[in-house]
Amino acid sequence: METLTVHAPSPSTNLPSYGNGAFSLSAPHVPGAGPLLVQVVYSFFQSPNMCLQALTQLEDYIKKHGASNPLTLQIISTNIGYFCNADRNLVLHPGISVYDAYHFAKPAPSQYDYRSMNMKQMSGNVTTPIVALAHYLWGNGAERSVNIANIGLKISPMKINQIKDIIKSGVVGTFPVSTKFTHATGDYNVITGAYLGNITLKTEGTLTISANGSWTYNGVVRSYDDKYDFNASTHRGIIGESLTRLGAMFSGKEYQILLPGEIHIKESGKR
């Protein structure tokens, strides 16, 4: 059986005249206007629901019109381009809201050109899962990065085997720690889990245990690079699975995501 390979065109300024094909993202309905409406809309754009809604719209459109239809391909590239543009703004203008990044006027989202405007760095915000897909489709395998401080890691020393084993062994004193461990980001962060999933980390620090059993760990965590692909997985979550279905429809190249930087962890407890 012959396999059909579909290449989605990258977002560019050469768009057809049907209104650019951008879907409208809809926050939960709030009667009337005023501060409450603004709060709801801004909160929606900061939430994973914004990313999931966009992916659902894309999947629904493809089901109705087919993955190889030229109009479908342009609509896919246009909507992904809006997210690339927003993520770019989040990187270039730290501290702005996702809503403002998505609606930034200069350049207008409809003028986003992946070939000239794509960035190595990703923001780590709710826009990033779709941007990670864009790099798979059009990035030609070039490595990307997201700062480890921006991916919302939650690390407990008691979930790190070497630290847990020392604490439970009954010893007392101060112990240097240097160990690698696997961490499932999708267990608590649907956005990070969608494009990183399980990652390999390394912690270095000092564990101090007192005679009464109280302990304190003070250290840093760094990450090894992660490969972005669509291999079989059980830890991607609802957004990650939607990305997997979309990625399977089109040709792309897997690539490395670098996670530069470090985060500090300090926790105390009693065995």
UniProtKB/Swiss-Prot annotation:
Keywords: Antibiotic, Antimicrobial, Bacteriocin, Plasmid, TonB box. It comes from the Bacteria. One of its GO terms (biological process) is defense response to bacterium. The keyword Kinase does not apply. The keyword RNA-binding does not apply. A motif (TonB box) lies at residues 2-9. Colicins are polypeptide toxins produced by and active against E.coli and closely related bacteria. This is a calcium-requiring inhibitor for murein biosynthesis; it causes lysis of sensitive cells accompanied by murein degradation. The target site is possibly the cytoplasmic membrane. This colicin requires TonB for its uptake. This is Colicin-M. It comes from Escherichia coli.
